[in-house]
Each structure stands twice: as C-alpha cells, then as structure tokens.
From Swiss-Prot:
Required cofactor names: Mg(2+); Zn(2+)
NCBIfam families xref list: rpoC_TIGR
Species of the source: Sulfurimonas denitrificans (strain ATCC 33889 / DSM 1251) (Thiomicrospira denitrificans (strain ATCC 33889 / DSM 1251))
Cofactor binding annotation: Binds 1 Mg(2+) ion per subunit.
Annotated Pfam families: RNA_pol_Rpb1_1 (PF04997), RNA_pol_Rpb1_2 (PF00623), RNA_pol_Rpb1_3 (PF04983), RNA_pol_Rpb1_4 (PF05000), RNA_pol_Rpb1_5 (PF04998)
Catalytic activity annotation: RNA(n) + a ribonucleoside 5'-triphosphate = RNA(n+1) + diphosphate
Protein's recorded name: DNA-directed RNA polymerase subunit beta'
Cystine pairings recorded for this chain: none
Residues involved in Zn(2+) 2 binding: 800, 874, 881, 884
Positions annotated to bind Mg(2+): 470, 472, 474
Function according to Swiss-Prot or TrEMBL: DNA-dependent RNA polymerase catalyzes the transcription of DNA into RNA using the four ribonucleoside triphosphates as substrates.
Length: 1503
C-alpha cells in the first residue's frame, strides 16, 4: 500500500472517508497546535450567572460559545456575525458544536511522566533507560536520585566500582557522593526534569547497534531476554520517528468541555463529569507550584509540590493504577480518562460497538399461529410511533394535511385517514425482530408486519426455535430498516423464509415442534380393526368426505394409488400427503411421523424444492399439526403411568445380591473398590431392566395410544429417561464430589419418595440450577472471545489453487462413532482424487465439491479416508478462498465472495455453549465395565494378521500378549496375491509405492498410492485411521509362495495397549480366517471369483452348502448392466448359501459361518491389571515388608494368605518384585499400592505366570473436564497441568540414571539420535525398557498438550486432534456443528509464527509475528539480497490471538485496552481498517458482503 498522507481535520472540513488510522505520541508542539488557549484557573462556571468563568475549564473564549451563534456578553447574536470575535468577552461567534472539538492546554511547570509509559508493563521509559520500574517510580516521585553523569565517582574507597550513568541512588548515597566527587563531574538529580533530559539525550541508533552486538555475544538466557525486550522498545521508536522525550509531558492537553459536561439538575445541584475534578486538581497544583517557584521556596516544599503534580496527572490519566485512587465527594474513586474507554461500560464496548438506535421499540411476544411464515403481528400503537416520519410524509403526500404540525395533530387524534395511510406504508415494508441474547445470525430476522390490536407482537411458531423464544413473558425488539439498501437486504437476505437452515450444521431449524409434532404423529399412527379399514381410496378428497361422514377412522389402514402402484397406508397419512409437494417419495411420508421423520421430510423438501416451496409447505404443516393436536385431545393422567408388576420382586432380588457382595467383602474376598463397583453394577442393571419392562408396558398400553408414550415417542415433549423416573425407579444419584452414592432411590415419582430419598435427590437439583447460571456467563464469554478472534475471516477469492489438504476419517472415541466420514465430507472440496477400492477407477477427481449424495457414494464404496481442502491449508492472503471453505451451510451453495465466515463460525460454536454442561454429567457408575471391556470381538469378515505381535505360551497353553505397545492384531482381506513364488521388493517413488514379485524367470510390479498404505505409527495406534488402508505382510526381500497375499486391505484392527491390554489372552492364530454372515446388500446376480494377482478370475459352479477351503474367494453382485455393484470377501470355513448365478436382493444371505458364535479376538480380566513373568526363574521381594509396606489377607476360597501392598507406602520404600531368570538376568517389577501378590518370596515361576494383580481404578463418574471448560481449554491452547511427555522421534526406550529423583527416559532412534526426557514425581512412565515408540506417542501419564503436538507432529496432526476433541464434546451433547467452523477458529489460532532466527529482518528472536507480516518482510529482504528470517508455526490461544490482532482498534476494544494503546502509540502503529470490528467502531461500511465492492466502479453494458 502506498504511503498515505495524514488528513488535516479542521472544524468545517471533515473527511467523508478515511483509509487508515495511526496512533502516535503527541509532541508538545502538536498539543499546542490543537489548543485554542491555556486553561489557567480551576474554576468551572459562575454559580450566580451560571456562565463559564474566563480562563477556566469551561471558558467560552478558549472552547467556543455556549449558545449557538451568540457571544458570552450578548453583544453579537445571530448567524450574520459568524466568525466575528467579540472585543468585550473575546468569544468567537460560531456554532456551539465546536465545544466538542476545541481543546485547551495546561503549561506544566515541570515535566511529568505519562503513567502509561511508566506503569504499564513493560515500562517503556524504564526499559529505554535500562532501569527497574520500581526505581524509575522512586525517581519520578522524588524519593531517589538518578545519575546524569558519573564523572570520576566511585562507590568504594578502593575505586573498584565506578558510579555509572542511570544508577539510582538514595538520599544517603547521594550526599556522600556529592561531598566527595561533586567537583569531579558527578551529577545526579531527581524528578521528571532529569528523566526528560536523559530521554532526550539517548542516541537510539547507537544504543541499537550496541545492544545487537551484546545479544550476539551473551550466553545467558535471562540476559538475552532482557536485551531483546530493550531492543523491541528502541526499535519501535526508531521505526516510528517518535521522540522518547515525548513520553514526558510538558504541555497537558485539555479535553473539549462538551466531552466532560457539567449538567445542572433540578434543585440547583450539578452533575459533573469526574474528569473535571481531576483537571481541577492538576491546575490547582500547577498554579501553586508556579507561585512556589517564583517565591524561591525551600527545595523540600517545591519537591513535594512537584510530586503532587505528578500524582495528580497520573490520576487524570489512570486513576488508581499507582497507589490509592483519588476519591470524589461520594467516597468512590473518580473515573479517569483510561477508565472512560476501557471495559464493558467504556467508550469502545458501550457506545461504539453497541449503540442504541432510533426507530426501535420493544414489547412482549405472544404466539401467532394464524400468521404465514414471513409475517409477524405488530401492534398498531407501535407502528404509529415507529413509522411517524413516514406517516407525516404520506399524509402530506395525499393532501390530508398541509403542514407537519397538522399531520402531527392528525396522528395524535388517530383519525381514519391516519390508519389508512399507515396500512399503505406498512404494506410490503419489512421490519426486523430481534430477541436478546443475540447468539447467532438467526436471532435477528425480517418479517412483513400485520397491524393488530393489543400491545404484544405476534410471532410465528416456527421461528421460535431460531430465536430460542417461548411465550412465558419473553420480550422482543422491533427495528425499522430505513435506507433502500437496508430494506433490500432485509427482504433478500433476512426474511424468515430465507433462514430455514441453521448455519452451524445445515440442518433445518424452522421445523415443527411440540404440539405440531404431536398432531402430525397422532394422525400417522395406525389402529387395527377400526371403521373403514382396508378400503381403497382414489384421493385425499374421498378420505376427507369419509371422515366427515364418520365412515372412516383417521387411523384406519387403507389402500391408495401412488406412482401407479397400490400402497398400504392410513387415512391420516393421506391427509399429510395432501399438503406435501409432489416430489416427496412415499417412503418419507408413509410411516409414523416422529420429530426426526418430520425433520427429514423438511430437509428433503428444502433440498429438492428450494426456499419458496419450503416456506409454504412449513405453513401447511404447522396448520395440520395444530389442528389435529387440538382434535386429538391428548392429555396426561396419572393412570397413564404404568408401574411394572415385577418391580417389588426385582428390587428384593437386587437387595439380596447387594447383601451377598457385602458378605464377600466382609470375608475379605473383595477389595473396597471391587465391592463398590459391583454394587453400583447391580443397581444400574436393575434400573435398566425395570426401565425396559416399564417402557414395554407403556408402549403396549391402549395399543400404543397411551398419552405419555405418545408425547415422548413422537419427540414432542419428555423423554424415556423422564418416564423411567415417573414409573420405574429414580436410580442412582451422585454426591457433590461426583462419586455415585451406592444406595439408589428405589421409589419413582408416582409412588413418591421418602425423606432420605428426597434429601439425596435435592443435591442434584440445586446444583443444576447453580450450574445453569454460571454456564450462561461462561458461554457468553467464550462466544465473545471467538467472535473477536475470527471477526476478520472472510472469503476473499474463489480459489487459491493449493493442492494441499488434510486427510480425514471417521471421528470415534473408543469405538463409539462421534462423526462419520460421510458427514465430514458433505459440502467439502476434495484435495485429492478418491479412488474406488474395487474397480480402481477415480470416483471423484480433485477439486470436486461433494454433496450429500456423493459423500454417501464414497462411504458406501467402503472408502475410510479422504483428503479435503480446509481453511487451515488455504493459501489466500487476508482470508480464505471459497473452495477451501466449501458450502455455505445456511444456503447449501458454495460460499460466496465476501461472506463473513469467521463470525458465522464463532456464532456456531458459541451459540450451543449454553447447552453444554459445565461438568460432564454422571450417567452411570461402572455400568459400562461389562463385556465390552473384557474382550474384543470381530464384527467383519476376513483373516487375522499379527503386526509385530509377540506372545508367550503360559503353562495352561494360552497365548498371552507379550508386547506392551507398537503391535496390533489386524483383520484383513487380500488385495493383491503373488501370481508366482518369488521375492518381494518394495520401493517408494515420490507419492507412489511399487511392490514387485520377482522369480528367476519373471517380474511383476504393482503400483499403489503412498497415502493409501497404513503407516507404522497408524498401525501402532498413534496416528490416524488404518481401516480401509493397505498393509504389506512381507518386508522387502522376503520370499513368498504362489497365491500368497502380498497386499491386504485392513478391515479392522486392535492395537496394543489401547484396544488389547498387555498380558491379555489372544484367541485367534495368525492367518486364521474370521467368518461372518454375509448379505448381498444390493439387487442382482451373485458371481464367485478367486483373486489371482490383482485381478479376479471367475470361479464357477459353487453350490449351496459348500464349505469354502479356497483362499481369496470373492462373491460379487452384478446388476442388470453386468456392472459390479458390490464385492464381498468370503473367508475360508464359510458355508455358501447362495449358489453361483443366483438372483439376490439386498437381504439375501450369501454365505454364513459354520457355527453362530462370534469370533473373540482377545480377552482379559476387566477388574485388574496383571503383572506377568517374562521368563522362567526365581522371585525375590524388595521393600515388601509385612506391617510396613504390605498387609496379609486371608483368602477364604483357597484357605491361604496373600500379601497386599498397603494403600500408603512410606516414601523411602519402593516395593519391587525381582525376577532372576535362569541365565542370571534380573527383571524388576515395581508394584503399586493395593496390588495383591500371587507368588511367595523365593518361589520358582514359569513364563507368563501371574505374579501380581493391581485392581483397576475406582470408576468415578468421569472427572475429565468435559463440556464448556474443555472447549475453552482447547481454544485457549492452555498447557494442561498434567502434561504428558511425548517422544519427538521414533526409537527404542531405555531408562538412564535418575537425576534428582526424576526418572530419565532415553529414546534412541535407528540413525543414532538420542533424546532424553525427565519424568517428575507427579507422572508415571507408561513405557517400558525396550519398547519401540513413535514420534508423538506419550511416554508418561497425563494429557497431551496441543503445543507439543504441533511442535513434534505438525499442523495436520494437531488439526485432526483439535477437531476431534471439540467435536467429541459437542456431539456427546447432541449438538451438530460442522467441522469447518472449528477449522476457521483453528486457522486463526495458527495465524502467528515464532521467529527462530531473525536474519537481516527487523524481527527479534522469539517474537510472535502474523504470517502475513512475516511473508511481506521476508519478501522485501530477499529482494534486497539479505538473509530472510526463519520461523516455526506457533499455536496462540484465542484470547491472546484477539489481543495481538494486527488491527489496533479491534484489539483495544477486546481486552487490555491501555496496554494495546500504549504499545500502538510508542510504535506509531497504523490500523489499515481491513476487518469488521474496527470499521463498526469508526462507522464505515464493513468490508464483507457487498461491502467488499465498496471502492469498485460498476460497469453496465447495454446489448
């Protein structure tokens, strides 16, 4: 951008538009040039005449006339004297508006420091002079001396330590030095003058070069830091052309009087702005000081007065920053200039970002069920007031009134003409409705008003969800758009019918709820054997007539024609079909319409019919719902609540089970933890059983027409969980600490709770209310931070032409799917071709925009990962390109240029914040430690491959897992087989991997894409997804037999230790087939093939009942065009059910296993972690001493005693079991507290014997930060307290010598790199000696820090981690948010880089610089032939990112206002006004939407 020239602003010439705003320090000359005169007296106005005093704070001579065009003494009045200066009172005759512009000044007798540059860290004056802030304050407040020149002075008699310039001395030192060296050039002074002189005398360039040398030479970390700090400040002065001496004030500007008004109240009192009081103190002290100096008063008195002057100026700028705040008459601190601009009540947030506007009103809302989608009811009274100017114009226009006065009179009388004109104005004129809190863009929508009587606004029921409004007393505000542009915008973009989709997820939000759902659900239910069953109806009119004549029940099953075939439906569903558009298929409406089903229909209509169709359809749906909900007359009765008959018995049985567990515990068979876990299990199980019995009862009651069941089942109100509390048992409750109380509430609400039960349940209820209050505030703050950090993200171009993308896959958390790949692909652009794994054809090329259909195609093709373009990898400057962002979810189209995607992202993440829990709710105790945590079961077909898996064979002949990590059991199917025996060679060329098989006579090569092959860290469970990727069972150079598979597709995998714990028993052998029931899944004909090489060879003549012995048998289903529709792998040992060439439909069984048992891959003890012997040998105990570190436990079953490590082991003991193997090697096993030991001292053990067992930790209801705190933790990039250490390289672990009680972990890579890590006491290592770890894998317990992840694994890994973590929180609460919103925020967190080497640039090492500035500076330096700077990506939390925004105005209005402005003034920063916030503040058009074309000429062509 070319250098812009500052605009000279004068009183009569104000700029219409500005390009930039610069902040600078004001020189004394500048202050004088602003000033219109010196304020000499502290007086304000004369109490008798109420006229301003001359030379006082409100002086008319300095600041301008009090009355428009009238001088103070009244000699000159009226416009004709404009510009005349009255010779009597000295006032210029002009508009009184100048009192808002004209400034005055105060000549200070002595220079005074500006408190911002002293006390706001880092203290600028202190840093420049190189003295501590405390010392600087002592000098300024006349408590200490600062050395101006040391001369030949020394502190000690031996002349060893010289007195240096800038040393700070106390009174005593000063006296001594003056008496000894006063003649020899020693000079020291105190106060503002000396500081100003010192600042004036600094040669910045000299100092800069000298410090640059120092920083190169110094070795110490701390010194480097302090020098870098100084360099930064010096550099900012050098670049800005500011003079450091200007930080000391010699002339104080005085604010224009109308900005610090003095208002007279009734009763002769005055309301006065605090700033006036602060100015008066400054003037008083300054005048007194002047007199004292003239009188040549004693030094001590003058000094005191100077100190008081400094203090009063400090108070004026920032009261209370230093020492005690100056208090006013009413004992509260006075509001200084800093306080006026900062904080929620400050200028920025109160008056600039949120203004109150004209033409607005607010009132209560009531429901308007008769309105159509775009309408709202507006009370006539309000309309009359809001449209008053329009009305006056209209009345004059029509000739009903001749003058404004007459028109006003008519409006007051409310004559008929007025109503007629009002109706004409309002017709087609949109109004905006807004409901606070405005959490997202749907909280402000436009409607066409309908004039109504009464005093309440009527709101359409369907828009309530978007506004989050209900009718229990909510209020809404109305705003009138005035300009034609605003009206157009309201009509085109903001009408309610345009806002059917939620920008956060693209799902419809204006969908029926509550009564409407109930009505629609009710009419789509079916009943057997009612009037008119099985009749045939031609159309809906016949149905209506029949119902009206009572010949047909609305729930009767009837038949009708649809698409030329007869379908079975019900009378009610035909009524529903009548209001649907024609293109809706019957499977969408011919079913029981629950809330979800209705939403699906609305989504379908929106996608295929567009906005116009949808709006009309929604209105018809609303009317139908309300009508039938009314007619159904569904009500609640206590008898609808059905309590299961077997409840008493079931509870009695559970009590007995608990009693048994208690007895076992008392006998010492169970630990306290096991007892607790088991009891909780019993009750959870009881509660679930009762709940299912009760739900069955309610469902079957009245043949499905039980009112309570209908309400919950339809999704209108209530849930199964609530019915369970009404009719089952209330269940387990949690203590304040989050532990679950083991005595449950047995009663339900119908029976009533007893006193104890009631008391237990009150805690949860009260906590719920407290949480809600806290939550709202937290969620609001999170939204504000998000908006602030993302406000400048907009779409700047269509395509940035990057080829980079990020690999994505399903997000799941320990087998529960959180977000599917299909969902994640919808509305995104591919960054790489997607290849069909079956046919190897390109399904979708790079650059394709995927919609729901294509995303589904990809998912159904069995593809598990894909590369997509994301905002994070976008190369656009100052924004994002449309293709990296994808679809705008609110419209379903590719996003348009100028869309403010940052704000939309922030709102989408912030708005559901209130729904997130503050702490995770505690659903079950250990209800989950059931079968799933004892074993893993194969759910797909294929065969088993061990990856790195080693096993021990125990004495019972079991296979026990010997790996602690970096191993897995894979379930695969063959992809390529070796066509002949030979040697396998694998080589990587660019992004392709070539696998070849060579025999003596022949070589064959297969080419695969590199990113389709599972990487070692992915196989070990450290990286991304392995499902759907390829695995090479043979290493390069291995020999293979003919028809052995050399490339396999991974269908599932269980890695050690996260899916299969150490020391589990593996129940499947390497290479064993896993059979499943295989269904056709498509219509067509079955054909069987065998895999040969990488192609399929026809295998004919298979009959039903055949047991498969072939390897690599595939069944394909081909469609009528002989195209392969689907391919299934048939594992050995399956029984063929569908013979070759059989015709099948999707549900046909093709093959099945021999027996129906599922294949268990591995199983383990769910209640404890075993320690097993790794070799045979002899056991020896260390530090296991009965009574000190261990206790004896008697086992009733075996009759033996067993040692158990005590709960609290004294610090000096480390209980260890040492195993001496037969060849003399020693293996040490440290045992934790509560471990039971299964061997005796000196016993002999065999491989894989259990030595000891540690019980798994007590299952507290999850205490991991969940909900809101977790989200803000992720976005703030906080370093968690308990950070896990992560390995930076791939390598083998060993343990070195401990250092100061810290364990030393060494990771050594193949190429000889060693990395050392020290584990402190609070963490425990999770790796063992000899383990192989991958980069990014954790070495100790704790949470992985995002910063570490970024440093070691890079941006893409961090991206996947953050997106999945945030999604986990939101999805678990049932909130759908598209990934792209999280990505936009994440991109903003990465917009800065950290300088590692500064090269020849102006950066300083360790600086955080925005990527844009970094690139610009480097480009400039390279052009000049210098060395560019080197930087690394750096993750900044959203608060820091917002405060360090490139725009000063935006940063200042967010937080730390004084700090930001201080920094900006010193470095003379320029705000380019590129983003939303600063433009809102100064009142320009914002540069998004049509605002991006603001400066462009538009050409119209005629043809």
């Amino acid at each position: 951008m070319s250098k812009l020239v500052p605009i000279e602003v004068t009183e009569d010439r104000r700029p219409t538009d500005i390009k930039q705003i610069q902040f600078r320090l004001a020189s004394p000359e500048k202050v004088m040039s602003w000033s219109h005169g010196e304020v000499k007296k502290p007086e304000t106005i004369n109490y008798r005449t109420l006229k301003p005093e001359r030379d006082g704070l409100f002086c008319a001579k300095i600041f301008g006339p009090v009355r428009d065009y009238e001088c103070l003494c009244g000699k000159y009045k009226k416009m004709r004297y404009k510009g005349v200066v009255c010779e009597k009172c000295g006032v210029e005759v002009t508009s009184t508006k100048v009192r808002r512009i004209r400034m005055g000044h105060i000549e200070l007798v002595t220079p005074v420091a500006h408190i911002w540059y002293v006390s706001s860290l880092p203290s600028r004056i202190g840093t420049l002079l190189g003295i501590k802030m405390k010392d600087l304050e002592r000098v300024l407040y006349y408590e200490a001396y600062i050395v101006e020149s040391g001369g030949e002075a020394y502190y000690d008699a031996e002349a060893k330590t010289p007195v240096l310039k800038y040393d700070v001395l106390n009174e005593e030192q000063y006296r001594t030095l003056v008496s000894r060296f006063g003649e020899l050039g020693f000079k020291a002074r105190m106060g503002g003058e000396v500081v100003r002189d010192l600042l004036d005398s600094i040669d910045l360039v000299d100092l800069f070069t000298q410090l640059k040398e120092d920083i190169e030479l110094t070795k110490s970390e701390a010194k480097t830091k302090t020098i870098a700090k100084r360099l930064k400040v010096i550099e900012s002065f050098l670049n800005s052309g500011n003079n450091p001496a200007w930080m000391m004030l010699t002339v104080l500007p005085v604010l224009p009087p109308d900005l610090r008004p003095l208002v007279s109240l009734d009763g002769g009192k005055f309301a006065v702005s605090d700033v006036n009081d602060l100015y008066r103190r400054v003037i008083n002290r300054n005048q007194r000081l002047k007199r004292l100096v003239e009188l040549e008063a004693p030094e001590i008195i003058v000094r005191n007065e100077k100190r008081m002057l400094q203090e009063s100026v400090d108070a004026l700028f920032d009261n209370g920053r230093r020492a005690n705040a100056v208090k006013g008459a009413n004992k509260r601190p006075l509001k200084s200039l800093s306080e006026i601009i900062k904080g929620k009540q400050g200028r920025f947030r109160q008056n600039l970002l949120g203004k109150r506007v004209d033409f607005s009103g607010r009132t209560v809302i009531v429901v308007g069920p008769s309105l159509s989608m775009d309408e709202c009811g507006l009370p006539k009274k309000m309309a009359l007031e809001l449209f008053k100017p329009h009305l006056i114009a209209k009345l004059e226009d029509k000739g009903y009134a001749t003058t404004v006065k007459a028109a006003k009179k008519m409006i007051e009388d409310k004559t008929n003409e007025v109503w007629e004109c009002l109706a004409e104005i309002v017709d087609g004129y949109p109004v905006l409705l807004n409901r606070a809190p405005t959490l997202h863009k749907l909280s402000i929508q436009a409607f066409h008003p309908k004039l109504i009587d009464g005093k309440a606004i009527q709101l359409h029921p369907l828009v309530c969800a978007a506004f989050n409004a209900d009718f229990d007393g909510d209020q809404m505000a109305v705003h009138i758009p005035l300009s034609s542009a605003a009206i157009a915008e309201a009509k085109v973009l903001m009408l309610a019918s345009m806002n059917i989709l939620l920008p956060a997820s693209g799902k419809a939000i204006a969908t029926p709820s509550q009564d409407m759902v109930l009505g629609i659900y009710y009419i789509t239910l079916e009943k057997n054997g009612v009037k008119g069953s099985n009749k045939l109806f031609a159309n809906v009119d016949e149905v209506r007539i029949a119902i009206e004549h009572d010949a047909l029940d609305i729930h009767a099953k009837v038949r009708t024609r649809d698409d030329g075939r007869i379908i079975h439906t019900t009378a009610g569903r035909m009524l529903l079909k009548a209001i649907l558009p024609n293109f809706v298929p019957s499977e969408l409406w011919n079913r029981v319409m629950k809330k979800k089903a209705i939403n699906e229909v609305v989504d379908y209509v929106q996608k295929h019919g567009g906005i116009g169709v949808t709006a009309g359809f929604l209105d018809r749906l609303k009317n139908l719902g309300f009508k039938h909900a009314t007619e159904a007359g569904i009500s609640i009765s206590i008898d609808d609540i059905k309590i299961p008959a077997g409840k008493e018995a079931k509870i009695a049985e559970s009590k007995n089970r608990v009693f048994e567990i208690q007895k076992q515990f008392e006998a010492g068979l169970l630990t306290e933890q096991e007892r607790y876990n088991k009891i909780i299990d019993v009750w959870t199980d009881t509660n679930n059983t009762l709940a299912t019995q009760m739900m069955d009862l309610v469902q079957t009651d009245k043949a499905g027409f039980n009112s309570i069941h209908m309400m919950a089942d339809s999704g209108a109100r209530g849930s199964a969980a609530q019915i369970r509390q009404l009719a089952g048992m209330r269940g387990l409750m949690a203590k304040p600490s989050g532990e679950i109380i083991e005595t449950p509430i047995i009663s339900n609400f119908k029976e009533g709770l007893n006193v104890v039960e009631y008391f237990i349940s009150t805690h949860g209820a009260r906590k719920g209310l407290a949480d809600t209050a806290l939550k709202t505030a937290n969620a609001g703050y999170l939204t504000r931070k998000l908006v602030d950090v993302a406000q400048n993200v907009k779409i700047v171009e269509h395509d940035c032409h990057t080829h980079e993308g990020i690999e994505i896959s399903d997000i799941s958390d320990q087998n529960t799917l959180i977000e599917s790949l299909e969902d994640r692909l919808n509305g995104r652009v591919l960054a790489d071709d997607v290849i069909d794994p079956i046919s190897n054809e390109i399904l979708f090329a790079e650059g394709t925009l995927l919609d729901e259909v294509s995303a589904k195609v990809i998912a159904e093709a069995g593809i598990k990962t894909a590369y997509i373009r994301t905002p994070t990898t976008c190369k656009s400057e100052n924004g994002i390109c449309a293709l990296c962002y994808g679809v705008n979810l609110a419209t379903g189209q590719i996003v348009r240029r100028g869309e403010a995607v940052g704000i939309i992202a922030a709102q989408s993440i912030g708005e559901p914040g209130t729904q997130l829990t503050l702490r995770t709710f505690h659903v079950g105790g250990t209800a989950s430690s059931t079968a799933q945590e004892r074993q893993v079961v194969a759910e797909k077909e294929g065969f088993i491959r061990y990856y790195n898996l080693k096993t021990y064979v125990s004495k019972e002949g079991r296979n026990i897992v010997a790996n602690r990590r970096n191993a897995a059991v894979l379930l695969v199917e063959p992809k390529i087989k070796a066509p002949f025996s030979g040697r396998v060679e694998i080589q990587t060329v660019h992004d392709e991997v070539i696998i070849s098989v060579s025999s003596k006579t022949d070589t064959i090569r297969y080419v695969l894409r590199k990113n389709e092959i599972a990487k070692p860290n992915e196989l070990a469970g450290v990286g991304g997804q392995i499902e759907g990727k390829y695995y090479f069972p043979y290493e390069s150079g291995a020999e293979v037999q003919e028809y052995e598979s050399i490339v396999e597709t991974i269908k599932d995998g269980w890695n050690v230790p996260s899916r299969i714990p150490y020391a589990s028993e593996v129940l499947v052998a390497n290479g064993a087939p896993v059979t499943q029931k295989i269904f056709a899944k498509e219509d067509g004909v079955v054909k069987y093939f065998l895999l040969r090489g990488d192609y399929l060879e026809r295998f004919e003549g298979l009959k039903a009942g055949y047991e498969v012995i072939e390897k690599g048998l595939f069944a394909t289903v081909v469609d009528s065009n002989n195209r392969e529709a689907v391919r299934h792998y048939i594992a050995r040992g399956s029984i063929i059910v569908a013979e070759d060439d059989a015709v099948v439909d999707p549900k046909t069984l093709i093959a099945k296993p021999k027996n129906d048992e599922s294949t268990v891959i591995a199983e383990w003890d769910p209640y404890s972690n075993p320690i097993i012997s790794e070799t045979s040998g002899t056991v020896k105990f260390e530090d296991i001493i009965i009574g000190t570190t261990a206790t004896e436990q008697y086992d009733e079953l075996t009759g033996k005693t067993r040692l158990m490590i005590s709960d609290h082991v004294p610090a000096e003991y480390k209980p260890t079991i040492v195993l001496a193997s037969e060849d003399g090697e020693l293996l040490r096993y440290q045992v934790q507290s509560k471990t039971s030991i299964y061997v005796e001292d000196g016993a002999k053990v065999k491989v894989a014997d259990i030595i000891a067992k540690t019980p798994k930790a007590l299952q507290k209801s999850s205490d991991i930060t969940g909900g809101l705190p977790r989200v803000s933790e992720l976005f703030e990039g906080r370093r968690p307290k308990a950070t896990a250490l992560i390995s930076e390289i791939d390598g083998v672990v060993s343990f070195g010598k401990s250092l100061r009680g810290k364990i030393r972990i060494i990771v050594a890579s193949d190429n000889g790199i060693l990395k050392e890590y020290f584990v402190d006491k609070s963490h425990t290592p999770v790796v063992n000696s000899g383990d192989f770890v991958h980069a990014g894998e954790r070495l100790t317990s704790g949470i992985i820090s995002s910063h570490e992840l970024l440093r070691i694994m890079g941006v893409k890994t961090l991206y996947n981690y953050l997106v999945s973590e945030v999604q986990q929180v939101y999805r678990s609460q049932g909130v759908n948010i598209s990934d792209k919103h999280i990505e936009v925020i994440f991109t903003q967190m990465l917009r800065q880089v950290k300088i590692l080497k500064s090269g020849d640039t102006k950066f300083i090492e360790g600086d955080l610089i925005s990527k844009v500035k970094f690139a610009q500076e480097n480009e400039k330096i390279i052009k000049l032939g210098g060395r560019p700077a080197i930087a690394e990506p750096f993750l900044v939390g959203i608060t820091r990112a917002a405060v360090s925004a490139d725009s000063i105005i935006s940063a200042a209005s967010f937080q730390d206002t004084t700090k930001v402005l201080t920094e900006a003034a010193v470095s003379a920063k320029v705000d380019d006004l590129n983003d939303l916030k600063e433009n809102v503040i100064i009142g320009r058009t914002i540069p998004v939407g049509t605002g991006i074309y603001k400066d462009q000429e538009i050409m119209f062509g005629y043809n």
